[in-house]
């Protein structure tokens, strides 16, 4: 026996067609790259032409197969159009990764209707509509997979991001509901809850602040923020053949953050 046989049996995505939203940078780019390396043909969704092109070029340069899909994502119509374009370019959809998202850091009392709608539309509304539009295509797959990107706020509260946290908690609930409704169609639906991950977005707004970095280094048991690539092992498992009996679950990849804190002095 060889380790290659184990990989093929549990993790190979050969012949699979995956749509990853928000795939032109950060976590989405890492997931799209990983899936292509595992053998999938990946639809790289985004809204920035250059970032999409760079990601597609990077994946194809590694010997993978990726196609660009530029599409606004803020409504039911946008969601349906995106799925239709992905099916046209990929020939179908076996895997849907709902990764696109946005955030505004502000106290709940200061949230405006504009900011509220901007966060809700991308983080929650479009996740629902994308799943609904993709369902007929996933049903045709031998084992369709949906992976929703949640957050620590899917599982716990964090101040200053009330609307964002609300959407991610709802995504966790949606994950369970769809898992229950679509298990009969052999569609598995799971949620990935990243911790504090270093991406272009968080580098500018979080990891550039020495005080916040010091807090995270103290609070996270592994004493550092994570890299997008450190999410890809779980992201691959949850859409691969090895997770064919895993559905309705949320998996945190957070360096131990949600395990709790210690009352002992840190060394």
Q: What is the meaning of each model-derived region?
A:
Residues 90, 128, 224-253, 258:
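C-terminal substrate-recognition "lid" of short-chain dehydrogenase/reductases
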Residues 136, 180-184, 244:
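Alpha-helical segment proximal to the catalytic Tyr-Lys
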Residues 107-108, 112-120, 212, 216:
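Substrate-binding pocket helix/loop in short-chain dehydrogenase/reductase
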Residues 131, 167, 175:
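Active-site helix of classical SDR
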Residues 151:
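Residue(s) in the substrate-gating loop at a strand-loop-helix junction
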Residues 17, 24-25, 48:
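Conserved glycine-rich cofactor-binding loop
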Residues 2-9, 156, 236, 247-267:
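Short C-terminal tail/terminal secondary-structure segment
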């Amino acid at each position: 026996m060889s380790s290659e046989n184990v990989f093929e049996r549990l993790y190979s995505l050969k012949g699979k067609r995956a749509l990853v939203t928000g795939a032109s940078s950060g976590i989405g780019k890492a997931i799209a790259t990983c899936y292509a390396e595992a053998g999938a043909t990946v639809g790289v969704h985004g809204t920035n032409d250059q970032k999409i092109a760079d990601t597609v070029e990077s994946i194809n340069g590694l010997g993978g197969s990726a196609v660009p899909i530029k599409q606004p994502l803020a409504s039911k119509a946008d969601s349906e159009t995106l799925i239709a374009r992905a099916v046209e370019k990929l020939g179908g959809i076996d895997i849907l990764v709902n990764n696109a998202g946005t955030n505004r850091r502000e106290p709940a009392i200061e949230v405006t209707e504009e900011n509220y709608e901007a966060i809700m539309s991308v983080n929650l509304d479009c996740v629902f509509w994308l799943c609904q539009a993709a369902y007929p295509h996933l049903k045709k797959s031998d084992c369709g997979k949906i992976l929703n990107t949640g957050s620590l706020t899917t599982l716990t509260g964090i101040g200053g991001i009330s609307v964002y946290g609300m959407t991610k908690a709802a995504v966790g609930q949606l994950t369970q509901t769809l898992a229950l409704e679509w298990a009969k169609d052999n569609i598995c639906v799971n949620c990935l809850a990243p911790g504090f991950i270093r991406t272009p977005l968080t580098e500018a707004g979080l990891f550039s602040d020495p005080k916040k970095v010091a807090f995270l280094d103290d609070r996270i048991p592994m004493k550092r923020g994570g890299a997008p690539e450190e999410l890809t092992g779980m992201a691959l498992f949850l859409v691969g053949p090895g997770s064919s009996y895993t559905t309705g679950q949320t998996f945190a990849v957070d360096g131990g953050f949600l395990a709790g804190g210690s009352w002992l002095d840190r060394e």
